[in-house]
């Protein structure tokens, strides 16, 4: 019987989901493994003893981080105490690099092995973080093959586990059945709205999406809108921004993407999820002007959407800051719905993404890495 313990640390909804899938795979591989950590609802449901709720820690932008500093500091202090009093056999840090790289140092100080799952985007900005990774991380589990090559070049132990979204299950229901379930007409266009999972994203982006929706309706009166509610958000949080035309659902995002003709999305992992389902999309991004200015100085990338970053050529229009207006969003969605040649061109490009990212079940691949680290 194993008395080994693993700590899973996730600070955002996307990491919470990855942590939940990893927990399930670890339990299948090693049923007696003790799992605890920092996360949200999904990890809790997967059997992880979550002793730090990460819901308040999911922030975007430099200024926004300062506003949540007290909660972040409290989480750090709690983990440091845990490392000293109840050291696990391994800590798995999932994404969330600003927080997790700092805590990886604390884990190593306590003599604990460290696995980092989902690489910080050192290829985009602050490549110097590779020094911390070399010093404090025993093994990297990365989602993209180019990241594996990067770490191999730097002599960092690494496994390319594939991207979990590339192997995500598809709904068992037909398109018509899903539309019936959501009370939507399968013969009329459906646009999915993804305003993000963080409160400040919702506040900035959802009102714009709602206004864009009204403009789209003037051009396409039959259009239908659907908004999948992020697990960490209550309906009351977004209700003030909504119009009656938008149908809010609490369901697996795969059901929404199975019926959507187009999508409007905040930048982030969701853009890749949408793209992998070959749903044409437009990406919008808006943060505090100072945050954006600082980001432009630090980040050396042509694109902000993950689907554009991993594709050989851009697959989605990006509307950033002052360019993100209701009219600009409406114009692009209209093209995605009504311009047949343009639409087919985008769908064709989206079709090339999955083969690049699929390595089977990513969570099972990471679980094997965990198993090797704690039993080696």
Curated annotation (Swiss-Prot):
Cited InterPro entries: Glyco_trans_19
Pathway given in the UniProt record: Bacterial outer membrane biogenesis; LPS lipid A biosynthesis
Signal peptide: none
One Gene Ontology cellular component annotation held by this UniProt entry: membrane
Entry-linked Pfam families: LpxB
One example of a Gene Ontology biological process annotation: lipid A biosynthetic process
Keyword Transferase: yes
Enzyme Commission numbers on file: 2.4.1.182
Alphabetized SUPFAM superfamilies for the sequence: UDP-Glycosyltransferase/glycogen phosphorylase (SSF53756)
Family: Belongs to the LpxB family.
Protein's job: Condensation of UDP-2,3-diacylglucosamine and 2,3-diacylglucosamine-1-phosphate to form lipid A disaccharide, a precursor of lipid A, a phosphorylated glycolipid that anchors the lipopolysaccharide to the outer membrane of the cell.
Protein name: Lipid-A-disaccharide synthase
Gene of this entry: lpxB
């Amino acid at each position: 019987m194993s008395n080994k313990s693993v700590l899973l640390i996730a600070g955002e909804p996307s990491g919470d989901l990855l942590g939940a899938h990893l927990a399930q795979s670890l339990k299948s591989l090693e049923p007696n493994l003790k799992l605890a950590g920092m996360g949200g609802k999904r990890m809790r449901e997967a059997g992880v003893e979550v002793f730090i709720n990460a819901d308040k820690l999911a922030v975007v932008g430099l200024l926004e981080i300062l506003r949540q500093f007290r909660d972040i500091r409290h989480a750090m202090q709690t983990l440091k105490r845990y490392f000293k009093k109840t050291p696990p056999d391994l800590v798995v840090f999932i994404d969330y690099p600003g927080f997790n790289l700092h805590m990886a140092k604390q884990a190593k100080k306590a003599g604990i092995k460290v696995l980092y799952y989902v690489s910080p985007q050192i290829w985009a900005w602050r490549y110097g973080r590779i020094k911390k990774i070399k010093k404090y991380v025993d093994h990297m589990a990365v989602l993209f093959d180019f990241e594996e090559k990067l770490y191999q070049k730097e002599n960092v132990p690494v496994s390319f586990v594939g991207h979990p979204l590339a192997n995500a299950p598809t709904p068992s229901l037909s398109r018509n059945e899903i539309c019936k379930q959501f009370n939507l007409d399968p013969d009329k266009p459906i646009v999915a709205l993804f305003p993000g999972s963080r409160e400040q994203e919702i506040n900035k982006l959802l009102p714009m999406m709602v206004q864009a929706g009204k403009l789209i309706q003037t051009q396409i009166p039959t259009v239908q809108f659907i908004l999948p509610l992020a697990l960490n958000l209550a309906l009351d949080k977004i209700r003030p921004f909504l119009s009656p035309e938008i149908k809010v659902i609490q369901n697996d995002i795969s059901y929404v993407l199975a019926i959507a003709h187009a999508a409007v999305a905040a930048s982030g992992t969701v853009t890749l999820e949408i793209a992998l389902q070959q749903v044409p999309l437009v990406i919008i991004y808006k943060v505090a002007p100072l945050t954006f200015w600082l980001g432009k100085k630090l980040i050396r990338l042509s694109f902000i959407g993950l689907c554009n970053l991993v594709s050989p050529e851009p697959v989605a229009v990006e509307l950033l800051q002052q360019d993100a207006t209701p009219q600009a969003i409406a114009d692009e969605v209209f093209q995605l719905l009504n311009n047949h040649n343009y639409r087919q061109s985008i769908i064709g490009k989206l079709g090339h993404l999955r083969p690049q990212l699929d390595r089977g079940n990513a969570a099972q691949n990471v679980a094997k890495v965990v198993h090797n680290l704690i039993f080696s």
